[in-house]
């Protein structure tokens, strides 16, 4: 391991990142709280401000991926479609197999200048996660309980609110509903057999209702669906903790632009269309494992400096008073004060590790297990 790699793996560096993220995140969340005063006066101004405040938080994680870890991303796509990326609203359909696939989705959004306005369809429990979850609340993310009877109305209402959103955005959605594991895959394929659907090797059975309602609600606002199939070279299985340790990965992302008018309006036909899409995604993954590459032309969208600039700004803002406080405590010589300081740091570290744990595959939700079993029994 070289000197830079050794430095990046040090716990002290991780604590600095944790402190900057938590301190700046809570400051930004507080500012977002006060922006609620704007909502009844000027809703669009509220949205534009929160779009930029959101960028201040999410770009810190993208900075870790792109600058600290140095992870590279090659996009395989049609050059004609590439020219439209970042210039239109789009629904981005991502496979859900890796712990950092959400971060790669954010990186894609950042490369095309849409990170601040990017939306997700996320489980409602994430709305209570400090900093990121609260940020999502203020930027009108679409939350679901993953119980269709409850979500039918609430998700449609949330999506309708995005029809007049003033910023360009990618709406990121994992149609599989939960992250891929072998156990979930086995149960999902039992459901596929029971429904007479083709077997998928590298994906779970897509959940069509959420996708159909998203397309229906955003039609004539969103221009296209971007079908994105993600994989990593050398059979690597990247983790957020690995990114924090500065480990470099190389992502390959196959992106197909599908005009929204090509997607059926009827829900049943839309469902059949999505199942066919996932059969094609599965074939692309199989081809990648066989050849190590995706179809179409490889392109590397340039890494933008703004994520790094944003982090340096917040780091300088919150670290200077912190070090002043630290020096004053050391000079005081009070054992109680120092013990309190260490305790606060320990709690902060545990808190960030807990947020990282939300992304870990082996600690993921049991949704894909229990819900698929229920469908199998129906």
Curated annotation (Swiss-Prot):
One of its GO terms (molecular function) is 1-acylglycerol-3-phosphate O-acyltransferase activity. InterPro entries: Acyltransf_C, Plipid/glycerol_acylTrfase. It catalyses: a 1-acyl-sn-glycero-3-phosphate + an acyl-CoA = a 1,2-diacyl-sn-glycero-3-phosphate + CoA; (4Z,7Z,10Z,13Z,16Z,19Z)-docosahexaenoyl-CoA + 1-hexadecanoyl-sn-glycero-3-phosphate = 1-hexadecanoyl-2-(4Z,7Z,10Z,13Z,16Z,19Z-docosahexaenoyl)-sn-glycero-3-phosphate + CoA; 1-octadecanoyl-sn-glycero-3-phosphate + (9Z,12Z)-octadecadienoyl-CoA = 1-octadecanoyl-2-(9Z,12Z-octadecadienoyl)-sn-glycero-3-phosphate + CoA; 1-octadecanoyl-sn-glycero-3-phosphate + (4Z,7Z,10Z,13Z,16Z,19Z)-docosahexaenoyl-CoA = 1-octadecanoyl-2-(4Z,7Z,10Z,13Z,16Z,19Z-docosahexaenoyl)-sn-glycero-3-phosphate + CoA. The HXXXXD motif is essential for acyltransferase activity and may constitute the binding site for the phosphate moiety of the glycerol-3-phosphate. Keywords: Acyltransferase, Endoplasmic reticulum, Lipid biosynthesis, Lipid metabolism, Membrane, Phospholipid biosynthesis, Phospholipid metabolism, Transferase, Transmembrane, Transmembrane helix. Its EC number is 2.3.1.51. Belongs to the 1-acyl-sn-glycerol-3-phosphate acyltransferase family. It comes from Homo sapiens. GO terms for biological process: CDP-diacylglycerol biosynthetic process; phosphatidic acid biosynthetic process; phospholipid biosynthetic process. Widely expressed with highest levels in skeletal muscle, followed by heart, liver, prostate and thymus. The chain crosses the membrane at residues 11-31, 125-145, 307-327, 338-358. This is 1-acyl-sn-glycerol-3-phosphate acyltransferase delta. Pathway: Phospholipid metabolism; CDP-diacylglycerol biosynthesis; CDP-diacylglycerol from sn-glycerol 3-phosphate: step 2/3.
């Amino acid at each position: 391991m070289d000197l830079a790699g050794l430095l990046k793996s040090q716990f002290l560096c991780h604590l600095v990142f944790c402190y900057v993220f938590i301190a700046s995140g809570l400051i930004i969340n507080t500012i977002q709280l006060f922006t609620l005063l704007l909502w009844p006066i000027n809703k669009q101004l509220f949205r534009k401000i929160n779009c930029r405040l959101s960028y201040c938080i999410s770009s810190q994680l993208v900075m870790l991926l792109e600058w600290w870890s140095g992870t590279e991303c090659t996009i395989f796509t049609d050059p004609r479609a590439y020219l439209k990326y970042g210039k239109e609203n789009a629904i981005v359909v991502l496979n859900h197999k890796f712990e950092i696939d959400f971060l790669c989705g954010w990186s894609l959004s950042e490369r095309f200048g849409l990170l601040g306005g990017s939306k997700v369809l996320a489980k409602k429990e994430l709305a209570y996660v400090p900093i990121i979850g609260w940020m999502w609340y203020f930027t009108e993310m679409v939350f679901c309980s993953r119980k269709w009877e409850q979500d039918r109305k609430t998700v449609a209402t949330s999506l309708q609110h995005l029809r007049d959103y003033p910023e360009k955005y990618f709406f990121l959605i994992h149609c599989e509903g939960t992250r891929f594991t072998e156990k979930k895959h086995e149960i999902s394929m039992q459901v596929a057999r029971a429904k007479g659907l083709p077997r998928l090797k590298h994906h779970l059975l897509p959940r069509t209702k959420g996708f159909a309602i998203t397309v229906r609600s955003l039609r004539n606002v969103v221009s296209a669906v971007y079908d994105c199939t993600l994989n990593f070279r050398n059979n690597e299985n990247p983790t957020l903790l690995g990114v924090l340790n500065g480990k470099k990965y190389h992502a390959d992302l196959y992106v197909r632009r599908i005009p929204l008018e090509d997607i059926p309006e009827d829900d049943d036909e839309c469902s059949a269309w999505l199942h066919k899409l996932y059969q094609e995604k599965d074939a692309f993954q199989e081809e990648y494992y066989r050849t190590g590459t995706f179809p179409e032309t490889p392109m590397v969208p340039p890494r933008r400096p703004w994520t790094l600039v944003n982090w340096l700004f917040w780091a300088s803002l919150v670290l200077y008073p912190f070090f002043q406080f630290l020096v004053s405590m050391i000079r005081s010589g009070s054992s109680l004060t120092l013990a309190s300081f260490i305790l606060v740091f320990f709690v902060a570290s545990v808190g960030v590790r807990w947020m990282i744990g939300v992304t870990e595959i082996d600690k993921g939700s049991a949704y894909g297990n229990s819900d698929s079993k229920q469908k199998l029994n129906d």
